[in-house]
Curated annotation (Swiss-Prot):
Database matches in Pfam families: M20_dimer (PF07687), Peptidase_M20 (PF01546)
Protein's UniProt name: Succinyl-diaminopimelate desuccinylase
Co-factor binding comment: Binds 2 Zn(2+) or Co(2+) ions per subunit.
Reactions the enzyme catalyzes: N-succinyl-(2S,6S)-2,6-diaminopimelate + H2O = (2S,6S)-2,6-diaminopimelate + succinate
UniProt lineage: Bacteria, Pseudomonadati, Pseudomonadota, Gammaproteobacteria, Legionellales
Annotated pathway: Amino-acid biosynthesis; L-lysine biosynthesis via DAP pathway; LL-2,6-diaminopimelate from (S)-tetrahydrodipicolinate (succinylase route): step 3/3
Organism encoding this protein: Coxiella burnetii (strain Dugway 5J108-111)
GO terms for MF: acetylornithine deacetylase activity; cobalt ion binding; succinyl-diaminopimelate desuccinylase activity; zinc ion binding
Family matches, as CDD domains: M20_DapE_proteobac
Top enzyme class: hydrolase
Catalytic site positions: D68, E133 (proton acceptor)
InterPro entries hit by this protein: ArgE/DapE_CS (IPR001261), Bact_exopeptidase_dim_dom (IPR036264), DapE_proteobac (IPR005941), Peptidase_M20 (IPR002933), Peptidase_M20_dimer (IPR011650), Peptidase_M20A (IPR050072)
Coiled-coil segments on the chain, per record: none
Function text: Catalyzes the hydrolysis of N-succinyl-L,L-diaminopimelic acid (SDAP), forming succinate and LL-2,6-diaminopimelate (DAP), an intermediate involved in the bacterial biosynthesis of lysine and meso-diaminopimelic acid, an essential component of bacterial cell walls.
Length: 374
């Protein structure tokens, strides 16, 4: 059994449902310490994090990832227990197999092998690992980055081991991510008897035109690196608990996924202009969960693409598709950030899995990238 597969199995066995680490980080820390890494445990609240490093020079190359996983859902729908790593037809199944315990296992084994072969390597190799990526992400990577900045540690390059590949390992890497902003909107009407609508003000009826306008608005055209901004309602609630009552309020929740084309303030102003145009009485609360970032095709991305070409014989596609990741926190330091990991098709799904053969290739890609950077 390969070292990467062995480590992945150990991690899958730990039911580390966010924000519980379930001992995963102890396994990783013990392995890294055994090859000379210095490690700091950085707990914040109930979240476990660690920071590890080997070397004392620049450039500073960081591997970043998370040990927490999403809940398995209905376990009767799994063909094997979600926290029992199970090999079948060349794949390994288990919660976290794709997102992202395979990435973590490959990064750690690659770093181990590299420092064993190059104990006096140029540069510094580091790890930022958290158990708070699948949850609120308030006490995880963001807090570790704040800690490093307080210590004046300057990061140069970061590989986030998220499942970035689409159909084949290495066919895509992320060189940026869209931002995410949530809005919680309350449309205020007047409650009344449903038989006497002239004595009430129905917030549901009032909202229709404005909601249609918001849903049909073309916020931008995107650009060569980012798809157009997306606006989606994901929850609408109204009703007074009885069939003969016009409700006093309607509550709606929506989300923007946006490129660096806009500021959050510009998007907020556009929404409020539409609501005002339709003369709605409303209250709105905003929550910016992440700002967009774009690292571009820098030195790290160039070397990662070279490593993928050498090992997987693919011309990888750099893109900015998908959701948010902890790379957004690391990018605020000015560090070049890319995301490179396994195929993402089954992430968060029942019977989550990864191709076993991809584990060694992914380990080799990380190892080769370290060679090229140092």
């Amino acid at each position: 059994m390969s070292e990467t597969l062995n480590l992945l199995k150990q991690l899958i066995e730990r039911p580390s449902i966010t924000p519980n680490d379930a001992g995963c980080q102890t396994i990783l820390i013990d392995r890294l310490k055994s090859v000379g890494f210095q490690c700091e445990h950085l707990p914040f609240g109930e979240v476990h994090n660690f920071w590890a490093w080997h070397g004392h020079q620049s450039p500073f190359i960081i591997f970043a990832g998370h040990t927490d996983v999403v809940p398995p859902g209905d376990e009767t729908q799994w063909h094997s227990p979600p926290f029992t790593p199970t090999e079948k037809n060349g794949y390994i199944y288990g919660r976290g197999a794709a997102d992202m315990k395979s990435g973590l296992a490959a990064m750690v084994v690659a770093a181990e092998n590299f420092v064993k072969q190059n104990p006096d390597h140029n540069g510094t190799i580091g790890f930022i690992v958290t158990s708070d990526e699948e949850g609120p992400a308030e006490n995880g990577t963001q807090k570790v980055v704040d800690y490093l900045q307080q210590k004046n540690i300057k990061l140069d390059y970061c590989i986030v081991g998220e499942a970035s590949s689409n159909e084949k390992l290495g066919d895509a890497i992320k060189i940026g991510r869209r931002g995410s902003m949530h809005g919680e909107l309350t449309i205020i009407g007047k409650q009344g008897h449903i038989a006497y609508p002239h004595l009430a003000d129905n917030p549901i009826h009032r909202s229709f035109q404005a909601f249609e306008a918001l849903a049909k608005t073309k916020w931008d055209e995107g650009n060569e690196h980012f798809t157009p901004t997306s606006f989606q309602f994901y929850n609408v609630e109204a009703g007074a608990g009885a069939a003969n009552v016009i409700p006093a309020t309607l509550k709606a929740k929506f989300n923007f996924r946006f490129a660096p084309i806009h500021t959050t303030q510009q998007l907020q102003q556009k929404v409020e202009r539409i609501l005002n145009y339709y003369q709605l009485n409303y209250d709105i609360q905003w929550n910016v969960s992440s700002q967009p970032f774009f690292s571009g095709n820098g030195r790290l991305a160039t070397f990662v693409r070279q490593a993928i070409q050498e090992i997987c014989h693919l011309n990888t596609e750099p893109n900015t598709y998908g959701g948010t990741s902890d790379g957004r926190f690391i990018a605020t330091t000015g560090c070049e950030v890319i995301e490179l990991g396994p195929v993402n098709k089954t992430a968060h799904h029942v019977n989550e899995n990864i191709c076993i053969a991809d584990l060694e290739k992914l380990t080799d890609i990380y190892f080769r990238t370290l060679q090229l950077l140092t």
